[in-house]
C-alpha cells in the first residue's frame, strides 16, 4: 500500500513505479517538493487497473501479476543525458538496437534504430525517420549486447532495455515482450515486415507445409 511507504528512508531523489504496467512511474528529483497526495492518487488508481485489458488484451504478460509498488534509485549520468538502449533480441540473439537520447531533458526526444554493428537503419517508430551520421558508438556496446544475449535466452522475441552511463557502467531497465503494446506506427510501414521476418517460431517455422508432409 502507498501508506506503508516510509519516505523518510528514501533519498532526496528516487523513482516510484508499479510492477504491472508500462509508463506508470513518478520521477522525484527533490523530495522536499514531492507532492505526496498527488502521487498517492495516481498510484492507487494504477493499482486498481489491469494493464492487459487496458491495451486490448495485447499485453498478456501483465494479466496475472499481483500489483506492487516499487521505489528505486534515481539514475543520473554525471550531469549528462541518460542514454537508453533498447535491444531487440530474437531467439536469444541481439538483432536491432533502439537508441534514445534527450529522454529526460527539456529538449525534444530523439530516437534511432541501428543494427548491432552500429549502422543506422532506415526506419523509426511513432515519429518520422531521422538520420544522424555522427551518432557516437558507445564504448561498451559489446558488453551491452552480451548482457542482452544472456538475458534473452529461452525467449522467441524480447526487448532488453539498458542504460549506459558516462563512467562506463550499465544499468538494467526492463525486459519488454510487446513493444508499444504492438499497436505503434512504423515509418515506413515496411519496417513491420522486416521486424516480423526476424521472428522464428520453433515447431511452427520448421513444420512441413501442408501437403508436403
Residue ranges and their predicted role:
Residues 1-81, 91:
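Active-site nucleotide/adenylate-binding loops and adjacent lid/helix of ATP-dependent enzymes
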Residues 11, 82-84, 157-159:
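Short beta-strand-initiation
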Residues 30-50, 107-130:
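Glycine-rich, pocket-lining loop/helix-strand segments that form or immediately flank
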Residues 76-78, 95, 102-106:
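Short, catalytically relevant binding-site loops at active-site mouths
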